């Protein structure tokens, strides 16, 4: 046998072994492949009624048949004379406010600029001290007469960096004869409510985002990178700050912290809900209103886009990703949870909670 013939035989034997090995690997891989197509008449195919869609595991808010006959009873309506914070009171619990119908438009007035590609109106008007205070898309603050909408004063809050003109977020709050405002830039200002004159300005490293809450001699507002500032109302000094988990994906809303006594409850874009001591910012408890398994990219955003609400010893909060929960204010114990998500603060009236889901 020549060397050439021996080489050919060795090559053929090697190819045969290799093909056999490939066939074996292919057979093994086929048994492990979860996406292998199974014919309908395959005896090993599971019955059709045993196939469960993964969508069936998605939880959603369902009506309880046992509660269908429960009467919805609201507390006695009262006449509210002030709306000094973005969500009414510092606790955000407005209960059952009185209004005699039918409601008619008292006046209609255009003022300032609207939203555009570089700025957006996220701030809500407030009412205090017999005046309406509002902000336009440029960050101008207006004081208006509630009887006819006539302008009392107008103030332009200028960003020191002229190149930084883009702003999203903002809000106003009133306390002690002052209007506390930010327009989505790197500062929060205190204005004299009577004249609009700027009293002081507190600066931050990143733009403010959440609407301010002003109560108890302090102003609370958080920034785009989830850092909460507590600022002295009298002089604008930063008393303390709390850094939440940074989260770049958030919604264009302006929630505000809820405050009751010495407890501050802060919502963050990461889905965190943190209770802090108003004196020093020390954490009392925290929880995460996060939910995985969203079917779309936007459903995975965990932002607590609406303000939390404090009623007595309970806290109610809802994240965009689909968690509505009630907590004990003192301990942070989660009392109950429902699969509901939205952009707005829940409204509590008596023993009932009203909300709009997304």
Segments from the language model and where they lie:
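C-terminal motif of bacterial Sec signal peptides marking the signal peptidase cleavage site
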Residues: 18-21
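Bacterial signal peptide processing site
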Residues: 23-26
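Blade/loop signatures of beta-propeller domains
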Residues: 44-63, 69-106
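Extracytoplasmic beta-rich repeat domains
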Residues: 106-126, 154-173, 200-215, 238-260, ...
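Structural signature of WD-repeat beta-propellers
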Residues: 136-137, 167, 176, 183-184, ...
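Short loop/turn segments that connect beta-strands within beta-propeller blades
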Residues: 145-148, 192-196, 232-236, 278-281, ...
């Amino acid at each position: 046998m020549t060397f050439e013939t021996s080489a050919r035989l060795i090559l053929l034997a090697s190819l045969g072994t290799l093909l056999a090995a490939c066939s074996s690997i292919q057979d093994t891989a086929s048994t492990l492949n979860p996406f292998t197509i199974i014919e309908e008449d395959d005896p090993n195919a599971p019955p059709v009624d045993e196939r469960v869609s993964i969508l069936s595991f998605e939880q959603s808010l369902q009506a309880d048949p046992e509660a269908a006959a429960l009467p919805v009873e609201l507390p006695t309506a009262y006449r509210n004379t002030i709306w000094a914070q973005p969500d009414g009171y510092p606790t955000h619990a407005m209960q059952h406010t009185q209004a005699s119908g039918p409601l008619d438009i008292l006046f209609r007035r255009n003022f300032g600029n609207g939203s555009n590609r570089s700025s957006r109106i996220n701030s809500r008007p407030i009412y205090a001290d017999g005046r309406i205070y509002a902000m336009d898309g440029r960050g101008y603050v207006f004081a208006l007469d509630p009887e006819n909408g006539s302008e009392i004063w107008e103030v332009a809050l200028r960003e020191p960096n002229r190149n930084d003109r883009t702003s999203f977020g903002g809000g106003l709050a009133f306390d002690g004869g002052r209007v506390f405002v930010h327009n989505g830039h790197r500062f929060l200002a205190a204005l004299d409510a009577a004249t609009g004159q700027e009293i002081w300005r507190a600066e931050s490293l990143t733009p403010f985002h959440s609407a301010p809450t002003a109560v108890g001699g302090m102003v609370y507002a958080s920034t785009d990178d989830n850092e909460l500032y507590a600022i002295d109302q009298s002089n604008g000094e930063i008393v303390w700050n709390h850094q939440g988990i940074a989260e770049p994906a958030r919604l264009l809303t302006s929630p505000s912290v809820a405050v009751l006594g010495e407890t501050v409850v802060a919502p963050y874009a990461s889905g965190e809900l943190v209770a802090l001591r108003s004196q020093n910012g020390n954490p009392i408890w925290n929880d995460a209103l996060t939910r995985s398994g969203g079917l779309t990219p936007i459903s995975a955003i965990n932002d607590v886009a609406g303000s939390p609400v404090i009623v007595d010893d309970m806290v109610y909060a809802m994240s965009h990703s689909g968690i509505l929960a009630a907590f004990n204010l003192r301990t942070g114990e989660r009392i109950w949870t429902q699969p509901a998500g939205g952009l707005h603060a829940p409204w509590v009236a008596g023993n009932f909670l009203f909300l709009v889901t997304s």
